[in-house]
């Protein structure tokens, strides 16, 4: 949990946002109001794909791929459920990071349905999303990363709109109601924060 989250954040901020090129004549304005969500999705997908790379174990960045699996579980759970505790019932997602997380989690869930990559389970009146195939999920993250990078590089406004509007905006009202009720009973904060320390060299 903790290690995976930190490594994901490092990959997202340092390498995710720091990678990828746009074609000549293409800029942020090409994607208009969808740019921020696409860029956050690209950085998250970079982190999600590479956190499962065995090279990170070889380099000693993570002790084992179990760290990556834990991060996959956390990401899917947050993207499909946990973050909904911050949204009023009946509202759509508006914030770029939240749209990005739902976009990614919903897209890989849908595209992996035929192979049961992520299973939606209902038990005792509660919904759970269980990852059944981590390698297949990593490949789906890679597929979506390639598409999101293409959208950004080419300034494909329609491609960005289709991804975000189809996967990142609307919330399943039944699941949303369930999430709100479950978290109200837990009495825990829907937000967590971290502080980046300043290093003087």
Model-predicted regions and their roles:
Residues 20-41:
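Post-HEXXH active-site segment of zinc metalloproteases
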Residues 36-53:
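An active-site-proximal "capping" alpha-helix that borders the catalytic cofactor pocket
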Residues 149-164, 183, 197:
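Extracellular/surface-associated beta-sandwich interaction domains
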Residues 1-8:
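Short pre-active-site segment immediately N-terminal to the catalytic Zn-binding motif
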Residues 173, 182-197:
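Long, compositionally biased charged/polar accessory segments in the mid-to-C-terminal portions
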Residues 48-148:
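Long, well-structured alpha-helical subdomains associated
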Residues 199-201:
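Conserved small/polar residues in nucleotide/adenosyl-binding loops
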Residues 8-21:
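Active-site recognition of the HExxH zinc-binding catalytic motif
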